[in-house]
From Swiss-Prot:
It is found in: Nucleus, Nucleoplasm. Pfam families: EnY2. This is Transcription and mRNA export factor ENY2. Keywords: Activator, Chromatin regulator, mRNA transport, Nucleus, Protein transport, Transcription, Transcription regulation, Translocation, Transport. Involved in mRNA export coupled transcription activation by association with both the TREX-2 and the SAGA complexes. The transcription regulatory histone acetylation (HAT) complex SAGA is a multiprotein complex that activates transcription by remodeling chromatin and mediating histone acetylation and deubiquitination. Within the SAGA complex, participates in a subcomplex that specifically deubiquitinates histones. The SAGA complex is recruited to specific gene promoters by activators, where it is required for transcription. One of its GO terms (molecular function) is transcription coactivator activity. HAMAP family: ENY2_Sus1. One of its GO terms (biological process) is poly(A)+ mRNA export from nucleus. GO terms for cellular component: DUBm complex; nuclear pore; nucleoplasm; SAGA complex; transcription export complex 2. Component of the nuclear pore complex (NPC)-associated TREX-2 complex (transcription and export complex 2). Component of the SAGA transcription coactivator-HAT complex. Within the SAGA complex, participates in a subcomplex of SAGA called the DUB module (deubiquitination module). It comes from Xenopus laevis (African clawed frog). Belongs to the ENY2 family.
Amino acid sequence: MNKDAQMKAVINQKLIETGERERLKELLRAKLIECGWRDQLKAHCKDVINEKGVEHVTVDDLVAEITPKGRALVPDSVKKELLQRIRAFLAQHASL
């Protein structure tokens, strides 16, 4: 395992141990619902299914088509807030 992968694993473990990972996930979930991201993605899923026909779409097809749009639709403000929280966490746990 290279140094970056090792560091990532240590940080992830610390996020899990402290419960911060769950708090970040919950914050992200709430922010995405609040900004309408979830509704936009749900509508896009329905469009794809209607366009291709329910019999011709697998879950894997849907995930492959929706994922890039889903990532692109996340507002910059949400990304920045999450990044700020992660940086604050890392600053508090600088001994990692």
